[in-house]
């Protein structure tokens, strides 16, 4: 048998895997080619500015540790406020490609020209490399959502979830910026995949939850979900087995990852945590005050108002190219150019968003019926879908009064899986109806 025949035989035996890899490659290529079309967000400048921490952390991480009584510079403030993964990831790739970082952080209180003169606008090459490095994580997320879908409802369901994630307008925008939303989404999906496997590896689960949490703190519900799933699976299979071991492993790895990536905590961890929490509360209070004055619709104080805004942003509203109007006049052309592409608004608005909401509700309504027919192996993935949705929704609705579309990114994997479930159920219903008509 020659090499050509061997390759052909291998491809026939691994057709599904080859098809999946090709699909992942095509979607990733599409995302990559569209990077220049994505409008600039000043927070990208901040992440690139802080990416200098990559080299600082390699050379002497102890210098990054915070000490009570010392002055809080802008860099120290960001280390206290923001998770470190994104800036370190960007720093690695900028260092590898020898691209510069901005000289100064972006100052929202100043005008566009003032920030440019200060050197806060990233070099085009640096911005592109930063965005590209975020897109490079996307294949992991696509692979993960396909496998979670397969564990829940089989191959057709997996492909529907794959398509819905890859074409989601919120994902298209926010995972092609040099910001935290891309890593947050990918590590969250990988965690769901690991939890859905027949045998859960607590070491890997602790690692991916640690990476997700250190991309964005709103992913913390993943930790609660993992602990619940590990307890549930271990207790169900063997009540006498010491389930505590797996939980301890997850917690230890999670804490080790967080400590390793946050040298700001190393010298005075408790005092630093208190300072970080206080800084986060002050920032949130300031944001609420600013947006309440500038755009009251961006602030939702009551739970019903937050539910309304959540549904509006994840289903109906166009991609939110910017949360604040500071630089709208300067960036308006880029906003309109981006939104002029139909693919960037796919399944949004009254019709598209209404269809996605209908698919999601259908998925929720048909779950009990499907669950009765599903094999026992799908019980845990379904529990992950239900438990994860409830936990993540509770945190977002209970903690986040600001209506920033990108703040809802942690819910996107669950939304995609619910909508895929509804669409798959609809296909099944129509298929059965067609077969009955055909037989007659």
Annotated model-derived regions:
Residues 2-6, 193-203, 209, 221-256, ...:
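Perimembrane helix-loop-helix junctions
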């Amino acid at each position: 048998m020659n090499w050509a025949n061997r390759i052909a035989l291998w491809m026939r035996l691994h057709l599904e895997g080859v098809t999946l890899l090709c699909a992942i490659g095509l979607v990733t290529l599409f995302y990559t080619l569209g990077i220049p079309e994505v409008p600039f967000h000043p927070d990208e400048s901040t992440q690139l500015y802080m990416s200098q921490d990559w080299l600082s952390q390699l050379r002497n991480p102890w210098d990054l540790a915070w000490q009570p009584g010392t002055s809080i510079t802008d860099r120290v403030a960001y280390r206290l406020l923001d998770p470190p993964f994104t800036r370190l990831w960007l720093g690695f790739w900028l260092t590898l490609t020898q691209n510069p970082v901005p000289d100064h952080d972006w100052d929202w209180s100043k005008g566009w020209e003032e920030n440019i003169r200060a050197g806060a606008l990233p070099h085009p090459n640096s911005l592109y490399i930063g965005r590209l490095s975020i897109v490079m994580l996307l294949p992991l997320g696509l692979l993960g959502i396909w496998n979670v879908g397969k564990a829940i409802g089989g191959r057709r369901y997996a492909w529907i979830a794959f398509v819905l994630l890859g074409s989601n307008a919120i994902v298209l925008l926010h995972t092609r910026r040099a910001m935290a939303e891309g890593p947050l989404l990918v590590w969250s999906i990988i965690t769901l995949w690991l939890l859905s496997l027949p045998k859960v590896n607590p070491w890997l689960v602790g690692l991916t939850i640690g990476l997700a949490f250190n991309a964005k703190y709103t992913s913390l519900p993943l930790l609660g979900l993992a602990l619940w799933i590990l307890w549930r699976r271990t207790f169900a299979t063997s009540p006498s087995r010491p389930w505590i071991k797996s939980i301890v492993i997850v917690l230890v790895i999670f804490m080790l990852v967080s400590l390793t990536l946050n040298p700001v905590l190393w010298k005075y961890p408790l005092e630093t945590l208190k300072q970080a929490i206080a800084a986060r509360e002050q920032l949130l209070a300031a944001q609420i005050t600013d947006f309440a004055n500038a755009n009251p619709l961006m602030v939702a104080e009551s739970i019903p108002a937050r539910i309304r805004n959540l549904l509006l942003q994840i289903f109906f509203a166009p991609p939110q190219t910017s949360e604040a109007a500071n630089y709208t006049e300067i960036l308006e052309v880029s906003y309109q150019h981006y939104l002029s592409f139909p693919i960037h608004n796919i399944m949004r608005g009254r019709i598209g968003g209404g269809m996605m909401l209908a698919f999601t509700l259908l998925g929720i309504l048909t779950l009990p019926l499907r669950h009765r027919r599903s094999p026992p192996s799908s019980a845990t993935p379904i529990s992950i879908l239900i438990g994860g949705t409830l936990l993540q929704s509770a945190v977002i609705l209970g903690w986040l009064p600001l209506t920033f579309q990108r703040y809802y990114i942690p819910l996107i994997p669950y939304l995609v899986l619910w909508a895929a479930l509804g669409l798959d159920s609809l296909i099944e219903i129509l298929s059965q109806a067609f077969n009955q008509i055909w037989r007659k």
